[in-house]
């Protein structure tokens, strides 16, 4: 099984951007965590990050066209992007929404997700370990 782990705007700056909120883990560390977890689980993973909404939409179309499960941290797009929602809604394989911080303990606008109601599941506020949990669930569900 192959899984796409898709990360939205500013996640490439992990470890530099608001470490009090997102922790000191760098984006490279996140990629290593996902790749290591995938290896342990015997699945293939491709981790991507973009600051460009159209690129994210294209990746979601790719997942939809190839029946690939997705771990999606759409970051700020979670809270306002109808385009990302519409693309994500075309993914028929499981789609897990992940957020590093607990968005419900932050600014009010972050509590609204355009994705949660179309996601298979949501992992919020467990740091980067949420990605590993999402991958583990996907691997167990595919058995």
UniProtKB/Swiss-Prot annotation:
<feature type="binding site">
    <location>
        <position position="110"/>
    </location>
    <ligand>
        <name>substrate</name>
    </ligand>
</feature>
<feature type="binding site">
    <location>
        <position position="73"/>
    </location>
    <ligand>
        <name>substrate</name>
    </ligand>
</feature>
<comment type="similarity">
    <text>Belongs to the type-II 3-dehydroquinase family.</text>
</comment>
<feature type="binding site">
    <location>
        <position position="86"/>
    </location>
    <ligand>
        <name>substrate</name>
    </ligand>
</feature>
<keyword id="KW-0057">Aromatic amino acid biosynthesis</keyword>
<comment type="pathway">
    <text>Metabolic intermediate biosynthesis; chorismate biosynthesis; chorismate from D-erythrose 4-phosphate and phosphoenolpyruvate: step 3/7.</text>
</comment>
<dbReference type="InterPro" id="IPR018509">
    <property type="entry name" value="DHquinase_II_CS"/>
</dbReference>
<feature type="binding site">
    <location>
        <position position="79"/>
    </location>
    <ligand>
        <name>substrate</name>
    </ligand>
</feature>
<keyword id="KW-0028">Amino-acid biosynthesis</keyword>
<keyword id="KW-0456">Lyase</keyword>
<feature type="active site" description="Proton donor">
    <location>
        <position position="99"/>
    </location>
</feature>
<comment type="subunit">
    <text>Homododecamer.</text>
</comment>
<dbReference type="Pfam" id="PF01220">
    <property type="entry name" value="DHquinase_II"/>
</dbReference>
<dbReference type="GO" id="GO:0009073">
    <property type="term" value="P:aromatic amino acid family biosynthetic process"/>
</dbReference>
<dbReference type="InterPro" id="IPR001874">
    <property type="entry name" value="DHquinase_II"/>
</dbReference>
<dbReference type="GO" id="GO:0008652">
    <property type="term" value="P:amino acid biosynthetic process"/>
</dbReference>
<feature type="binding site">
    <location>
        <begin position="100"/>
        <end position="101"/>
    </location>
    <ligand>
        <name>substrate</name>
    </ligand>
</feature>
<comment type="function">
    <text>Catalyzes a trans-dehydration via an enolate intermediate.</text>
</comment>
<dbReference type="GO" id="GO:0009423">
    <property type="term" value="P:chorismate biosynthetic process"/>
</dbReference>
<dbReference type="GO" id="GO:0019631">
    <property type="term" value="P:quinate catabolic process"/>
</dbReference>
<feature type="site" description="Transition state stabilizer">
    <location>
        <position position="17"/>
    </location>
</feature>
<dbReference type="InterPro" id="IPR036441">
    <property type="entry name" value="DHquinase_II_sf"/>
</dbReference>
<feature type="active site" description="Proton acceptor">
    <location>
        <position position="22"/>
    </location>
</feature>
<protein>
    <recommendedName>
        <fullName>3-dehydroquinate dehydratase</fullName>
        <ecNumber>4.2.1.10</ecNumber>
    </recommendedName>
</protein>
<dbReference type="GO" id="GO:0003855">
    <property type="term" value="F:3-dehydroquinate dehydratase activity"/>
</dbReference>
